[in-house]
Amino acid sequence: MATIGRRAYAEIFGPTVGDRVRLADTDLLIEVEADYTLRAGGYGEEVKFGGGKTIRDGMAQSQRTRAQGAVDTVLTNALILDHWGIVKADIGLKDGRIAAIGKAGNPDVQPGVDIVIGPGTEIISCEGNIVTAGGIDSHIHFICPQQIEEALASGITTMLGGGTGPATGTFATTATPGPWHIERMLQAADAFPMNLGFLGKGNASLPDALHEQIEAGVMGLKLHEDWGTTPSAISNCLDVADATDTQVAIHSDTLNESGFVENTIAAVGGRSICAFHTEGAGGGHAPDILRVVGEENFLPSSTNPTMPYTVNTLDEHVDMLMVCHHLDAGIAEDLAFAESRIRKETIAAEDVLHDLGAISMFSSDSQAMGRVGEVVLRCWQTAHKMKLQRGKLPEDSERNDNFRVKRYVAKYTINPAISHGIAHEVGSIEVGKWADLVIWKPAFFGVKPFTLIKGGTIAMAAMGDPNASIPTPQPVHYRPMFGSYGGSLARSSLTFVSQAGLAAGIKERYGLAKHLSAVKNIRNVRKKDLVHNGYTPKMEIDAQTYAVRADGHLLTCDPAVQLPLTQRYFLF
């Protein structure tokens, strides 16, 4: 039987079992765990499109119609990187969803085919490329709509948060307050090739105004200290969430005016709640908000300006905070408020807590102490930094960093999906889910995607000069594709709403074009449900020195002096 060398095979069909791939210029190596394209019984039945290749009539392309089982699109020979595995496979898409993950081809002439290619099937060649689920950014200040294009170009396909534009309240808080603003933001969502979901204002001591917002269509509620996150507001907001199966996100009381972290934990009362920027630089009980990392009902996340900890982190934060929270540097109390939130000890511990799987999610805090286009990038920078500083994780072999990579990819994909009740639609590459996929060339992994697929349609891509004779000539930059225009846009993206809002008929009442998907199964979520990131240590934070201990171990790390995924990727 004819054979081919491993290097030649990888160059033609992409890596297979046992091959390793470096992620961009990081020190992270992944190894292919399984190859689903071998379901034909071994090598030799791979599919590939092009002149002289196998996806041709009567070969790997069958005569079957769509009604007879042919899929709409196949991503061939993709290296899937997801929380559940790192595998080589063909991916079949149909009706905007992932229809199958396995072996594509023509079942009339090939064995082991579970994805049928027909005359009506489009091909996206992924040989040598990595495919991840679209990222989810769960901490968005909707300050300007241009954030959405920036986020999409970085690999984010779902944005959750609140706001009404460049209003003072939105500069500081992720809340879309009241039915009128909620209706307007849901109508605006129809214009963007992005899954969107909005949080209402949760700061109230009586329930009626919160129920009103849930019924208007918000997918959850936000408690923010700038609106007064008191124990009574916390308890009332969670009562409404329990009654409506929605999530609550909390930014607690930095100044400890209405109580300390113990009082907030008591007011939450064991109920599920998302804790944003859990380290505290972004806000929360000073200096010990990190205590909540040890609570099983708190679902902790970080925002990206403190991640990873570098020699520049502390210097930029005070000025950034003053602007975001409408503070005046000429007022001593305002300056003290800002400085109380910036602590190098807790920022250093944050990196380590991520590596331990104790902080479960990444997000941006867009334009409000965070960078909307750097969620994915900073996540992988942190993984790289922790490998250099802490070494291999015990779950990883000497050959690869597969477990660490799965832990970190889960932080911006499946875990925010689970936490916010949207995991039935997005957050992973699994059959039945919305086909939001990001294709990366390995050399650019985590920093610059190659192609972005929304609901089965290409919505954005790194595209060359439109007047060139081929697609590749410079300048290559991110350009919207057909999935970002016209009726295709509305059919390729979702808007997440409450069950109550969907039942109230807001789609028709507001005249919405996008498909509305109701959040669900939220109120029983616990930290142990968050994939690869469910560690709940006993947390201790020294009120004088700010030293952080988890299960008795001091957590600290040095600031990075240099990082991957930086200047060499941004020369132009």
From Swiss-Prot:
It catalyses: urea + 2 H2O + H(+) = hydrogencarbonate + 2 NH4(+). Heterotrimer of UreA (gamma), UreB (beta) and UreC (alpha) subunits. Three heterotrimers associate to form the active enzyme. Gene3D superfamilies: Metal-dependent hydrolases, Urease, subunit C, domain 1. This is Urease subunit alpha. One of its GO terms (cellular component) is cytoplasm. The gene is ureC. Its cofactor is Ni cation. Its EC number is 3.5.1.5. Ni(2+) 1 binds at residues 139, 141, 222, 365. It comes from the Bacteria. The active site is at 325 (proton donor). Keywords: Cytoplasm, Hydrolase, Metal-binding, Nickel. It is found in: Cytoplasm. Substrate binds at residue 224. Binds 2 nickel ions per subunit. One of its GO terms (molecular function) is urease activity. InterPro entries: Amidohydro-rel, Metal-dep_hydrolase_composite, Metal_Hydrolase, Urease_alpha_N_dom, Urease_alpha_subunit, Urease_AS, Urease_asu, Urease_asu_c. One of its GO terms (biological process) is urea catabolic process. Pathway: Nitrogen metabolism; urea degradation; CO(2) and NH(3) from urea (urease route): step 1/1. Residues 134-572 form the Urease domain. HAMAP family: Urease_alpha. Belongs to the metallo-dependent hydrolases superfamily. Urease alpha subunit family. CDD domains: Urease_alpha. Ni(2+) 2 binds at residues 222, 251, 277. It is an enzyme of class 3 (hydrolase). The modification N6-carboxylysine is found at residue 222.
